[in-house]
Amino acid sequence: MKNKTKNEACPFRLRASRDALEIIQGKWRIPIVISLMYGTKRFGEIQRDIGDVSPKMLSQELKALEENKIISRTLYDSMPVTVEYSLTPLGHSMEKLLDELLNWGNHFRKEIVGK
Amino acid sequence: MKNKTKNEACPFRLRASRDALEIIQGKWRIPIVISLMYGTKRFGEIQRDIGDVSPKMLSQELKALEENKIISRTLYDSMPVTVEYSLTPLGHSMEKLLDELLNWGNHFRKEIVGK
């Protein structure tokens, strides 16, 4: 067996990454944020962007993102009442992370799926 | 209600991001990859880096990462037999994504937790 360098991983890096992972976990949160990168939207418009998310799940995930201050929900006192979702500055700060996710997703697809 | 630009999210972006998300999903895969960024390691060394992962879960997640060609597993015919894990080139290609995850995790912590 070759002699290899074995350094312990930086606990600071591990913690920060786990914080981020906790926020973006699951199948729907990142797609929701990507959808709202394209502008303020109503519930049905987000659902249309994502395609295969159930209303119940979308509603739950929007709530979680709102609690974490990634998106904001605005209620308009119109007839009928209108609700719109948009990214907060914290939500917009995810843009570079999403770009890297996209880059790596493409790379992975090319390497593994081969197209 | 103001008139706002409402563009549909790019389906290509959504698909690539979902590919990437599927690979890194869960609490442990990213920490495992971070641990192995610091060098080839044995099971116990990875477990020590991460801290609170159970052996059963770690074993399951290492297997999933191996199936997706993110890590490789090498068996040494020593006494006792030794198993080592390391990142493949595809695993190493996650470095920029992990950096952004770390950056955003720090930013999020400062904004929300306030420290």
What are the language-model segments listed below?
Chain A
Residues 1-12:
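N-terminal intrinsically disordered/low-complexity leader segments
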Residues 12-57, 77-78, 84:
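N-terminal helix-turn-helix DNA-binding core of bacterial DNA-binding proteins
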Residues 14-17, 21, 95-105, 109:
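Hydrophobic alpha-helical core bundles mediating ligand binding, dimerization, or RNAP-core interactions
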Residues 61:
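Residues within the DNA-recognition helix of helix-turn-helix
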Residues 69:
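Glycine-centered, phosphate/nucleic-acid-interacting loop/turn motifs that mediate DNA/RNA or nucleotide
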Residues 72-73:
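Short beta-strand "wing" residues that participate in macromolecule-binding interfaces
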Residues 77-101:
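Basic, amphipathic "hinge/linker" alpha-helix immediately C-terminal to the N-terminal HTH DNA-binding motif
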